[in-house]
A protein has these predicted regions:
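Non-catalytic C-terminal accessory region of glycerolipid acyltransferases
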Residues: 9, 46-175
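Catalytic core of membrane glycerolipid acyltransferases/transacylases, capturing the structured
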Residues: 1-45, 69-79, 83
């Protein structure tokens, strides 16, 4: 959310996965899209994806958070810090359709300055390739590169390794 907020002064389009609680959705939606922003932020379930694709054919920026584990569907397993991670491949499909650039962005807390800093890397080159697995690995390695700037401040609370390759143990304690 902090990276999206820091980029919201620019004309960007973004989507988010709604929470189960309507009140939380209201607060989060309000904080993600203030009246002074140029950002347009939509809940995934109420915004047709074709609108994103049409918007990307114009000079627009689509802020897409790809470091989520949404299960087996639309994912490919690739290494992420030496663990097989279910990596979203939707960004690959978006690039194939729109020919847009993919620019890795990550927001990290800088313990020295006590501020959040948005790191923007150079666009991925040769993306997409002929291999979904290679593309998933490229996406993950771009995240690794940015996370390595300040590893301890990355949002490790996300359950990245929730979806496991078949016959691989679940890494978290079952509560």
């Amino acid at each position: 959310d902090f990276a999206g907020r820091s980029l919201s002064k620019y004309p960007i389009i973004s989507m988010y996965k709604p929470f189960r609680n309507d009140l939380i959705n209201w607060f989060v939606g309000r904080s993600r899209s203030k009246k002074t922003d140029n950002a347009s932020v939509f809940p995934r379930d109420n915004f047709p994806f074709k609108n994103v694709l049409q918007a990307l054919k114009k000079p627009n920026v689509f802020f897409y958070v790809g470091d989520e584990d949404l299960g087996y569907e639309n994912s490919e397993f690739a290494d992420f810090f030496f663990q097989q991670q279910s990596t979203l491949v939707a960004i690959r499909k978006i690039v194939e359709i729109t020919n847009c650039s993919v620019v890795p962005v990550l927001n990290l807390f800088d313990s020295k300055s006590s501020k959040y800093i948005t790191y923007i890397d150079k666009p991925l080159s040769d993306f997409p390739s002929d291999s979904i697995t290679c593309d998933a690995r490229l996406i993950n390695s771009s995240f690794e590169k940015l996370i390595n700037i300040e590893k301890t401040e990355y949002m490790w609370s996300l359950r990245f390794f929730q979806t496991r390759p078949r016959n691989v143990d679940y890494p978290y304690k079952k509560l």
